Amino acid sequence: MEAKAQTPQQWRDSLNSINNDIRLFPNLTRLHLQKAAVLLQLLDWNEALEECNTVLLKDEGNLSALFYRAYANNQLHRCAMAKDDYEEILKQVPKHLEARIGLVFTLIWLNRLNDALDHANILVEMHPDNSEAYTTRAGVEMELKQYDTALYDWEKAIALAPQDNELLVQKAETLIALGRKQEAKATLDLAVKQGTPKGTLIPLYKQTK
């Protein structure tokens, strides 16, 4: 879950403020969703689930509550439950990027790699100009040891997000897996040139020799 950088104390202060508002307006869905989002930032998965369930009891199709609940359930290793929520979101909004990505990784954790690849393919078809679609599919392909196709997807993602050095590192790892060590070293060199500290890449550099 991405959010603006705040300290844990700032998140707790936000939670206290939201709780005060909920005491005044206990039936406002927006407040319960805000509370769930803050609880996720505080890694309080069970409390976040309670807030999501409060919303879903009144509005069973609420997309934000389903998404937050899926995320929390994955953190609690309840991947089958997370899968159900992601699928419900996608029934309502088939092009929901984050839910499709969440479903792909949930299926990986459930060791349903072929299903994960199917959804990753759908993701790329629906979002051909989004680098995350290609990185998600590449992640599945790496799990399946389909390194050639993973390399293609890393390269597509890099073309869409050329300043993302993590993609270069992933590409280098894939080239190493393919035995293409010189190309891997050149890719690592580019990542260093673009700002990645070389010291963090020493283990990979060693594998290119």
Give the ranges of each region predicted by the language model.
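N-terminal leader/linker segments that initiate helical-solenoid repeat arrays
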Residues: 1-46, 50
